[in-house]
């Protein structure tokens, strides 16, 4: 296998690893946001600062995941 293909394979593996890490973090944030937005809690007692920070991070993660997904598809197409 030539060095360029090995490098491409390494980039693909790294991108997939990063995607899985972000996916795990996003899943954790969804659970956290659901817990913070407890529908049985009085609205005055909700910690909206934590909710805001968590939702903001979730948005950043989803944008990173979309970018990584496009990169992964591009790298996989180069193997064909």
Residue ranges and their predicted role:
Residues 20-55:
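Short E/K-rich amphipathic alpha-helical oligomerization segments
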Residues 32-35, 39, 64-80:
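Long amphipathic alpha-helical coiled-coil segments
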Residues 1-24, 56:
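Short, charge/polar-rich alpha-helical segments
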Residues 16, 25-27, 49, 66, ...:
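Intrinsically disordered, low-complexity regions of eukaryotic proteins
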Residues 1, 8, 15-16, 44, ...:
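Generic cytosolic/nucleocytoplasmic N-terminal low-complexity/intrinsically disordered segments
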